[in-house]
């Protein structure tokens, strides 16, 4: 019987007990027993000592209450996460193996677990950032997922992260990255004159210094918000994206920008032309609400075309949507509607949120399938 505070999901796959240690943000723990998965309440963001202590105590409690002896410990691919370090220490103590699971693979797997999908699926994972198998920050991924295996079919065309993680807190930096990508880097200093680091960021982008490339959809939203002058600095996660969504909802439905996106020869989705259109909309004389609505509609249209193309190419019978960007109801509803018009069967998170709180379930599901290889 599940603890009253834990969430229980019955799986279609069974095996030795798995302990999954989740992600860095919105951490949860998942423990499996036979074909039952038990997901803990939210542990929280692992940057604090309190959250790390809660993780330790949560694992101890769950193993005790469910009389579980894990046979494997699953964790995120990122080596610096506390959850990863805990997983290795716990496994070493019990002399059991660990399994590193790619972040976006786990996002899609969590929905597969919830919807009892045992066949291969086409997965669209959209979020802030998760470490990819190529050691770069992913976040706008089209994946072919078959149990413990996955293949990256395509991704959003990358943008630079000037200053690395700092760019995730400062949307103006992502806007600067968009300007540089569109060969308008010479505008950065004047456009962001109120930012003391503007000149430094312009030099960084021009010289490609401390500017890792990311395929993140969350950072694309930040770039749009920064270009429109809606948000320059964020005080909490996804603040700029939520402001952009709120403006778009105020305006109402619009048609997507004609030729606002391109699917490249190597199956990447490029929104350069959309960003280019937004660059000249920052002035007060432009309707920012309309621009925000145009951004949402064009992103949804591009994603739908991208998914449809790959679904036909790979003969996908199921499409899975997951990742924190799907908290955005406007994007979620528009994309789901467009895909439904194409008669594509869509599966989205229902019992758990689309964000990183479901990562542990996905890790556990993958580990159970890995044991069957």
Describe each PLM feature range:
Residues 152-165, 205-209, 344-350:
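Short beta-alpha connecting loops at secondary-structure transitions
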Residues 76, 95-106, 318-322, 329, ...:
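Conserved phosphate-binding/catalytic loops in two-lobed NTP-binding clefts
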Residues 1-70, 78-90:
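Active-site-adjacent structural elements in enzyme catalytic cores
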Residues 12-32, 121-145:
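Gly/Thr-rich phosphate-binding beta-strand-loop-beta motif of the actin/hexokinase/Hsp70
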Residues 1-18, 100-123:
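Conserved phosphate-binding catalytic cores of ATP/NTP-utilizing and phosphoryl-transfer enzymes
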Residues 23-53, 57-58, 180-204, 208-317, ...:
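A contiguous, well-structured pocket-lining segment that forms one wall/lid of small-molecule binding clefts
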Residues 104-126, 131-132, 171-180, 289, ...:
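Glycine-rich phosphate-binding/hydrolytic loop that grips phosphoryl groups
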Residues 67-80, 314-325:
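Short glycine-rich phosphate-binding loop at a beta-alpha junction
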């Amino acid at each position: 019987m599940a603890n009253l505070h834990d969430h229980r999901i019955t799986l279609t796959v069974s095996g030795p007990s798995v302990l999954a240690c989740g992600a860095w943000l919105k951490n949860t723990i998942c423990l499996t027993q036979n074909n039952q998965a038990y997901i803990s309440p939210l542990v929280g963001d692992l940057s604090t000592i309190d959250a790390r202590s809660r993780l330790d105590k949560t694992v101890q409690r769950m193993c005790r209450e469910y009389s579980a002896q894990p046979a494997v410990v699953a964790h995120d691919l990122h080596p610096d996460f506390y959850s990863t370090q805990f997983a290795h220490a716990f496994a070493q103590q019990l002399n059991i193996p660990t399994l590193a699971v790619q972040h976006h693979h786990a996002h899609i797997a969590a929905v597969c677990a919830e919807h009892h999908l045992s066949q291969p699926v086409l997965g669209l994972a959209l979020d802030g950032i998760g470490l990819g198998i190529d050691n770069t920050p992913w976040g706008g991924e089209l994946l072919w997922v078959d149990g413990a295996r996955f293949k990256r079919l395509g991704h959003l065309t990358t943008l630079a992260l000037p200053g690395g993680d700092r760019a995730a807190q400062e949307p103006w930096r992502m806007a600067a990255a968009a300007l540089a990508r569109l060969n308008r880097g010479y505008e950065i200093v004047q456009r962001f004159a109120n930012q003391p680091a503007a000149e430094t960021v312009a030099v960084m982008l021009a010289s490609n210094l401390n500017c890792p490339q990311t395929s993140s959809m969350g950072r694309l939203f930040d770039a749009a918000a920064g270009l429109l002058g809606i948000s320059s600095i964020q005080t909490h996660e996804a603040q700029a994206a939520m402001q952009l969504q709120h403006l778009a909802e105020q305006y109402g439905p619009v048609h997507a920008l004609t030729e606002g996106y391109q699917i490249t020869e190597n199956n990447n989705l490029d929104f350069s032309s959309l960003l280019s259109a937004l660059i000249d909309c920052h002035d007060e004389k432009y309707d920012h609400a309309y621009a925000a609505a145009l951004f949402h509609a064009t992103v949804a249209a591009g994603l739908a075309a991208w998914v449809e193309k790959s679904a036909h190419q790979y003969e996908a019978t199921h499409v899975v949507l997951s990742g924190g960007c799907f908290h955005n109801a406007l994007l979620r509803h528009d994309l789901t509607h467009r895909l439904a018009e194409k008669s594509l069967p869509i599966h989205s998170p229902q019992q758990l949120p689309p964000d990183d709180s479901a990562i542990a379930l996905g890790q556990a599901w993958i580990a159970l399938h890995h044991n069957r290889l």
